[in-house]
Amino acid sequence: MHTQRKGIMLDTGHYMNTTTQLKTPEDAVAYLNKMIDKYEKAQMLHWFKGMHLQLSLGGDYVRKQRKEWREHPIDFDKIPFYELFRLAYDHACHIDLHQPFIGEGVREFVERVAPKYITLEYQQNSREEYEQFVETQSKILKWITIR
């Protein structure tokens, strides 16, 4: 793109979902840092303008589902549309978990990327749970000021 108004929005959880090998938040931080190393080496770190900060460790579920579907294939043509939609939504929610990203190195990772914007989006069951998630994430970030 040939414009000054461009940038990258990093969705940490979506990037975590590109592998099924992550087990802990610390694994996720290491995986994200390895990716960011490449941008830093290419002198492109400044392109990151925003971050959708969330934790998604759905790898165990994905591996289990792959095995189950290989052993018991599903004929999607036989499933009514709205039931298929429900199944797909449920499946996506088990992969893309949208949990608070807490763990060793999270704050340092965010500081390293230094996004101008941070979005917190979670899967929650109530307003109270959402507020608890935001409070938990905020304690990790210590309301860091970036740029």
Regions found by a protein language model. Give the residues of each.
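Histidine-acidic metal/acid-base catalytic patches
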Residues: 3-12, 16-147
